[in-house]
């Protein structure tokens, strides 16, 4: 049981991480690694500044806390600090992957799965092929001096196939991937990937340059997702706005940025690579509208950025790993569905371009 220092805010995040990386280059095994590591990130805040420490010795957490507290200035009114007031005090256990835990799958089975995809890269017209299997499982606990006590897990795995199409008018390098939250989700995807690779080869061999000009474009779901991520998601990460009046004016809430049917959301609730039921400050995930009916309506926040802009937390304080402090970053960002069909979108873009 940790003893949190008095008159200071503090929190501790402990992570157990397991990762697997397998790589085949032109069919030859080049990498086969499994790693397990356990570490923690400790924070202390006195109302003026943060004191941080990362350690791979979680049994020394009390010493880490005490060392950081000795550097800080005790603040009897720390509970009234605008940052501290925004911290949620959640107590929960969300262990979603006890069944289907990737750590329980032998590496031999993972390698056999990867090899089952290798024949897709052995067709004519492909060179410099690379097949990869990646997975990660994280078991994370978070506790704070305010009383937060959270345990959660997440995991994901994927197959990535990369290649260069030969014989094309110009070099064409591309790749296809499949993502899943458990090992079973990566099985049986060969035919879909085979068709996608054939589509790439056909494109590389027959594509012609686009005539310069202005076009109405219809974006595939993948491209639309990248568009939402890059054009709206990053600008909504509110740490970019601190100290920049230009960014605040450019991204002012209430500003119209699109058609009235456009809504873009961010949330850690949906299962996927952005799944994050609680962020790394213990804030519960929720749906946050970045754009609603074409109007900027929200931003993504940590407790510090929410306090600085006098807004509410959103569950987007995320750390790369236990070696890093949490910063404001997206979870899952997407464009909300509308009422148009694919065919009606194409009819409305006659003479335009479809971006697959």
Located regions from the model:
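N-terminal small-residue-enriched
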Residues: 1-356
């Amino acid at each position: 049981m940790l003893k949190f220092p008095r008159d200071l805010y503090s929190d501790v995040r402990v992570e157990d991480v397991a990762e697997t990386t397998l790589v085949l280059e032109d069919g030859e095994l080049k990498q086969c690694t499994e790693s397990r590591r356990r570490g923690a990130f400790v924070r202390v805040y006195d109302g003026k500044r943060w004191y941080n420490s990362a350690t791979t010795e979680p049994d020394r957490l009390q010493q880490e806390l005490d060392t950081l507290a000795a550097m800080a200035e005790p603040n009897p009114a720390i509970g009234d600090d605008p940052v501290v007031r925004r911290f949620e005090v959640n107590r929960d256990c969300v262990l979603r992957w006890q069944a289907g835990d990737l750590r329980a799958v032998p590496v031999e089975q993972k390698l056999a799965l990867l090899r089952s995809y290798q024949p897709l890269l052995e067709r004519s017209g492909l060179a410099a092929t690379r097949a990869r299997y990646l997975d990660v499982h994280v078991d994370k606990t978070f506790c704070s001096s305010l009383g937060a006590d959270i345990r959660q897990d997440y995991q994901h795995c994927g197959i990535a196939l990369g290649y260069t199409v030969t014989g094309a008018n110009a070099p064409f390098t591309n790749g296809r991937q499949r993502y899943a939250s458990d090992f079973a989700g990566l099985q049986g995807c060969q035919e879909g990937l085979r068709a996608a690779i054939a589509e790439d080869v056909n494109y590389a061999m027959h594509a012609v340059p686009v005539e310069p000009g202005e076009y109405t474009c219809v974006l595939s779901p993948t491209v639309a997702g990248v568009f939402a991520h890059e054009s709206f998601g990053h600008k909504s990460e509110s740490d970019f706005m601190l100290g920049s009046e230009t960014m605040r004016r450019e991204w002012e809430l209430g500003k119209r940025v699109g058609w009235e049917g456009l809504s873009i959301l961010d949330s850690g609730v949906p299962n996927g690579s952005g799944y994050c039921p609680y962020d790394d400050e213990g804030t519960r995930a929720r749906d946050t509208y970045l754009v609603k009916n074409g109007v900027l309506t929200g931003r993504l926040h940590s407790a510090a950025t929410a306090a600085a802009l006098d807004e509410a937390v959103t569950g987007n304080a995320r750390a790369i790993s236990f070696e890093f402090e949490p910063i404001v970053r997206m979870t899952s960002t997407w464009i909300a569905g509308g009422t148009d069909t694919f065919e009606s979108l194409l009819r409305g873009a006659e003479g335009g371009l479809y971006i697959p």
